[in-house]
Swiss-Prot record:
Fe cation binds at C110, H153, H157. It comes from Listeria innocua serovar 6a (strain ATCC BAA-680 / CLIP 11262). This is Peptide deformylase. The gene is def. The active site is at E154. The lineage of its organism: Bacteria, Bacillati, Bacillota, Bacilli, Bacillales. GO terms for biological process: co-translational protein modification; translation.
Length: 183
């Protein structure tokens, strides 16, 4: 079972590397890590387990956050209609994105960042993702709103990008016109 001790923090070189694609068939270790990542997210959203094991609540995690510079991630997040998006995605790529932008009202956080970083992180409101499941089956997934923000945050990790790299350095509270704000 993964715990917060397994997650590397900002400053670790794995968080700034561009991760390499996995090849199929996946190794047993890659499959297990994908399962463990999803289990961590589910456990972190369970109040009792989170308290028992000292887990910070998370909705997404990428392999580089575990010092594994390979292109896979897990998300476990509900949208505003309470639809669950629970996936382990291997070699995910953004196929297309909306012109309409969105952000979270309180900014973003990260399991690898132990401090609050104020500022808006503006992202695409909708994305279409091409990825593979653990068996190498191709997936085409559409995300909108909060789940879209989460999956973009995790794909950034695969490219060595941290959420705060997107914040306006001169004016963190600047919000471009016509950005939809969630939360």
């Amino acid at each position: 079972m993964l715990t917060m001790d397994d997650i590397v923090r900002e400053g670790h070189p794995a968080l700034r590397e561009v991760a390499t694609e996995v090849t199929f068939p996946l190794s047993d270790e890659e499959k297990k890590l994908g399962h463990d990542m999803l289990e961590f997210l589910i456990n972190s959203q369970d109040e009792e387990l989170a308290e028992k094991y000292g887990l910070r609540g998370g909705v997404g995690i990428a392999a580089p956050q575990l010092a594994v510079t390979k292109r896979f991630l897990a998300i476990h997040v509900h949208d505003e209609k309470d639809r669950l998006y629970s996936y382990v995605l291997y070699n995910p790529k953004i196929r297309s994105h909306s012109v309409q932008q969105a952000c979270l009202s309180g900014g973003e956080g990260c399991l690898s960042v132990d401090r609050e970083v104020p500022g808006y992180v503006v992202r695409s409101e909708r994305v279409t993702i091409d990825a593979f499941d653990e068996n190498g089956t191709p997936l085409k997934l559409r995300f909108k709103g909060y789940p879209a923000i989460v999956v973009q945050h995790e794909i950034d990790h695969l490219n060595g990008v941290m959420f705060y790299d997107h914040i306006n350095k001169e004016n963190p509270s600047y919000l471009p016109p016509d950005v939809d704000v969630f939360g």
